[in-house]
Amino acid sequence: MGSVLGICGPMIPLAGSNLRGLAVHCQHQLPFSHDAVGVILRFQVLGCRRHMFSVVGEIQSFHNPRLDLSAGYPEHLKKFVDAEETESIRAEIRRWPGYAETPLVDLGSIAKALEIEKIWYKDESQRFDLKSFKALGGAYATARQLQKFVSRETNKVISIHDLLGGRYDSLTGDLVMTCATDGNHGRSVAWGCKLFGCRCVIYIHRDVSSARASAMEALGAEVVRINGNYDDSVRRAAEDAIAFERTVISDTSYPGYVDIPRDVTMGYTVMLAEIVEQLAGEKPTHVFVQAGVGGLAAMVCGYFWHVWRAARPRIIVVEPEAANCLQESARKGEPVVVEGELSTLMAGLACGEVSFNAWQILDEGASDFVTV
C-alpha cells in the first residue's frame, strides 16, 4: 500500500484562506510517471478549490540520477537541516503569543470520490496572524539575530522569549532587518521585527501586489519597490544592507551567506514535526512540494530523510515551467540560473536562482523535478 504527501504552495486559496499542505494515502504503490503527477495535481486542485479543473500545459519531469533512496541521512547535510534541532526551535516558538499547532485535515469525502484511502491537508491558514507557514521562518531568524546581539551587548545568555515585551528595545530599537520578498517571507520578517523590537526595510519587485505591500507596511515595515524580478530585489536588498549597515534576513542563500537562511528554513521544520506527529506512525511513499528557490522543498526533503532514514518517501519537487531553476540545475548537476520574465500565476515561485543551502540537500535527496 502506497501513500502520498503533497505540500501545496503558499498562495493557493481555500475558501479565502491559504492551503499549505495536502496528503494523499493511496490504495496501491504509485510508480512515478507523468500520469501519476497529473493525478496528484488533480488531488491538490480538489483540496484547494473544492472542484475539478484541468491543468493547462505539458508536465515535464526529470528523475535525479544521483538519488540513492537506500542511503541513510548524510552527516554533512546536518549543517543545512538537522531534525534533532527542531524540538528546541519548537519550544521557543510555542512560547510566542498566538502559537497553536495547525490542523491536518482529513478530506474523507474527496478521498472516497477518487477511490483513495485517505487525503489530508495541512491547513496553515491558522498560523499566527500571518496565516502562512512563512511565519515560522523569517520571524524566527529575526529573533535569532536579536537574541545573539543582546547576548553580546549584555554579556549574558538570553532566550528569544526574553525579547518579548520590550525589555531590550533600548538595545534593539535602532537595528534594521531587511529582505527581499514576494510577500509572505517579508510579512514574516516585518512581523518578527514588530514582535521582538527592531526596524524593518522590505524590498519587493514589480509583480508584487499593492495589497501585499500594504500588509507589510501595516506591520511597521518600510517597503521599497524595484523595477525588476525577485532575483533583482534580492541583489538590491543585499547591496543596500552593506551601504546602510542592515542585517539581511533572507530565505535564499549563496556562498558566504548561509547561516541566517538556515535559521529561516529550520523554522519551517516546526510544521514538519507537527505533520509527523499528526500522521501517527503512517509514512507517505511520495511527497510533492512546490519550489521557488527551494528552501521549503529542501526542508521537507531533509527533515523527512533525517526522521525516516532509508524508509523515507520519494520527494517530487514541482516548479512553474517558466521558472524551473531547480529542474535545470538537476539536469546539469550544478546550480543553473534561469533568466527571462519567469512569468507564472504563482508569483511567489517566480525565482530563477537556486538557494545554495537548498541545492545541497535537493541534489542528493530529491527524487524527481517536475514543471507545470
What is each model feature region?
Residues G47-V372:
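PLP-dependent amino-acid enzyme catalytic core
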